[in-house]
Amino acid sequence: MTPEPLEIDRLDRGVLSLRGPLTMENVSPFLNAVRREDAPTVILDFTGVPYLDSSGLGSLVAASTSCAKAGRRMALTGVNKRVMKVFEITRVEQIFLMFPTLSDALEAFTNAGTA
């Protein structure tokens, strides 16, 4: 079976829209896209991510750590119930800054002066 691709679109400086599952097959392109961003805050729009596996979860933690080491923040938006359940079971939802929508995240960071 051919793995489903993960499409990553750069919507704006620091804003990446993801479409497709975040799985073992897609970890490298995902991490590369996050590391290429030079904005003070990297916002990952998860609206199009139906699920993730343990490798995808690990890559999110790695991306968050990479951003923190570089003095940047990472936020997630549009996380569906299935993905949120994985976050809750593994308790990683506590380490991610999350917003219901991309608009909410952009507004929060614009008001804080860090978008």
How should each PLM-predicted stretch be described?
Residues 2-32:
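STAS-typified acidic loop motif
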Residues 9, 77, 99:
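General small-molecule cofactor/ligand-binding pocket signal
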